[in-house]
Regions:
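Terminal, compositionally biased segments
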Residues: 1, 63-64
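N-terminal acidic leader/helix
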Residues: 1-27
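Short, charge-rich amphipathic interface segments used for partner binding and complex assembly
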Residues: 30, 34-61
Length: 64
């Protein structure tokens, strides 16, 4: 899938995802159920991957 965003849109989306990431870390820390924590950690890894790719794309866009 291709999605074209302006730099400002990328910054907004990254900020929203970073906030969710911080919330997710807190949620993981307060979760006692092993399987649920495992699921949250999987979501955290996916979110980190998305943020990383979003940032890379933003840097490439600035260089262009």
């Amino acid at each position: 899938m291709d999605l074209t965003l302006t730099y400002e849109e990328v910054e907004l989306l990254a900020g929203i995802l970073e906030q969710r990431h911080r919330e997710l870390i807190k949620e993981i820390a307060h979760t006692d159920h092993h399987e649920f924590r495992k699921s949250l950690r999987r979501n955290e890894r996916m979110l980190e991957s998305i943020l990383s790719r979003l940032r890379e794309a933003a840097v490439e866009q600035l260089r262009a």
